[in-house]
């Protein structure tokens, strides 16, 4: 095996078993994650803590180039130079958390309904509710006053969390933000200023392209900060600073609670940045923190719309295509809504900035096209109403997600209006994510797809 490994090129995580050898297993890693699980008289090989969770609560992560020989008594780890090395055994807490679906049909449904609780846990880590101040759980190794530009890099749903954070950081901290999908960032040779901040977002902390982007940024001399759900992951271990989301294990392939917990962390970071840069007064900070504290309660209220959304899903399931529209921070949520629907129901869906409707998507509108409009009442609401009028004039079916004031102001005949609780527009994406997720979930249930493990998708994309 050692001789064969020396000839391999590219990324791999391998496990070898041998005929006639029931007490021998060999593993090797180069790129994708690989971990050793330690038990009593038993040893395991798996991708990460989630995979090994049902069997053991003690794991050692292999590093790139490592290979390991296991038997029931233990493991011997070698590095790329074939020298024996020690990799620390870490205790983790996912073993008991996987449990089951409780009374839910799918893990995704359970995870959607867990959001008020886990977002509340994440909130408590980043906000002092008594003083109404944001408190980072770790000391940041930089001063936001010295940061001239922020880059945010992620993939899939995490990139849409980053897109929302771009609005927050630019508005609250007056920091210019560049957003990239990791698969593009790592190859476009972006010039990064030494001492600026690069943020990387990943639920698993093992996303291959995001990890490669992190390594590129480190080589450029930027400060690196990761937002991850698995604090022992490769991205977490290689980042200068880690901000953990407290979503708990997320089993459904389509991310739900990890997304909203990422938003809570990023919102807290944006407020902290605004305060540090002198863009927010103490009164401003208190007002924003009060808004964050309300989010778990508002998410619980948003969940009460489920019976209405379940009914609507039966209509959506008859469609071949669905369009999602939003402005401001609702635009990234429109992208996320379209991604969720196509991921688990296999219905083609596209998300657009509402102002781009007349630049192409309007050609698709007819009586068969549902258009989901995400529009809390804010300073651009009237412009979004104008877009809805254009859709209605062409026979499109409008599904409006808004608050009570928005529902009263929008006099257009719509297929259905899903009324969300009243709240400020700044942090609305965390609450409006709930009906967006429920719509995708119930549509997929009607379609009869495998909601938790949709075809062709994996929970963690650990290869390019």
Residue ranges and their predicted role:
Residues 7-10, 52, 179-188, 206-208, ...:
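Short acidic loop-to-helix transition motifs that present clustered carboxylates
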Residues 11-42, 312, 317-343, 378-380, ...:
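Acidic/histidine-rich
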Residues 82, 108, 397, 410, ...:
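Generic C-terminus detector
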Residues 6, 11, 115-151, 241-370, ...:
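Active-site phosphate/pyrophosphate-binding segments
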């Amino acid at each position: 095996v050692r001789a064969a490994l020396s000839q391999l090129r590219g990324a791999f995580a391998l496990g070898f078993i041998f005929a006639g050898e029931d007490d021998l297993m060999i593993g090797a890693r180069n790129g994708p994650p690989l971990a050793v699980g330690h038990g009593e008289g038993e040893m395991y090989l798996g991708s990460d803590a989630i995979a090994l969770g049902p069997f053991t609560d003690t794991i050692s992560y292999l590093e790139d180039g490592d290979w390991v020989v296991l038997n029931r008594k233990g493991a011997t780890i070698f590095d790329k130079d074939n020298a024996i090395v020690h990799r620390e055994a870490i205790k983790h807490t996912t073993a008991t958390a996987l449990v089951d679906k409780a009374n839910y049909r799918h893990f995704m449904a359970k995870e959607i309904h867990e959001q008020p609780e886990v977002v509340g846990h994440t909130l408590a880590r980043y906000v002092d509710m008594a003083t109404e101040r944001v408190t980072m759980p770790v000391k940041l190794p930089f001063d936001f006053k010295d940061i001239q530009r922020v880059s945010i890099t992620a993939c899939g749903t995490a990139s849409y969390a980053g897109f929302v954070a771009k609005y927050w950081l630019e508005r609250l901290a007056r920091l210019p933000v560049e957003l990239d999908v990791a698969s593009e960032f790592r190859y476009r040779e972006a010039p990064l200023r030494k001492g600026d901040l690069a943020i990387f977002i990943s639920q698993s902390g093992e996303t291959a392209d995001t990890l490669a982007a992190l390594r590129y940024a480190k080589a450029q001399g930027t400060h690196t900060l990761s937002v991850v759900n698995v604090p022992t992951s490769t991205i977490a271990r290689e980042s200068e600073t880690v901000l953990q989301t407290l979503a708990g294990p997320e089993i459904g392939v389509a991310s739900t609670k990890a997304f909203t917990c990422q938003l809570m962390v990023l919102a807290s970071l944006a407020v902290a940045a605004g305060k540090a840069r002198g863009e927010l007064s103490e009164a401003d900070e208190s007002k924003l923190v009060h808004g964050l504290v309300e989010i778990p309660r508002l998410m619980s209220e948003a969940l009460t719309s489920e019976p209405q959304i379940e009914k609507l899903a039966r209509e959506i399931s008859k469609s071949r295509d669905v369009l999602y529209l939003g402005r401001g921070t609702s635009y990234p949520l429109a992208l996320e809504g379209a991604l969720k629907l196509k991921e688990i129901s296999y219905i083609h869906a596209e998300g657009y900035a509402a102002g781009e409707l007349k630049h192409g998507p309007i050609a698709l509108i007819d009586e068969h096209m549902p258009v989901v409009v995400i529009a809390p009442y804010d300073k651009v609401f009237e412009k979004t109403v104008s877009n809805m009028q254009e859709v209605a004039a062409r026979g499109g079916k409008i599904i409006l997600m808004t608050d009570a004031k928005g529902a009263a102001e929008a006099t257009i005949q719509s297929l259905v209006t899903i009324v969300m609780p009243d709240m400020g527009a700044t942090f609305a994406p965390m609450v409006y994510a709930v009906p967006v997720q429920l719509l995708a979930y119930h549509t997929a249930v009607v379609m009869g797809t495998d909601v938790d493990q949709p075809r062709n998708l994996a929970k963690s994309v650990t290869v390019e």
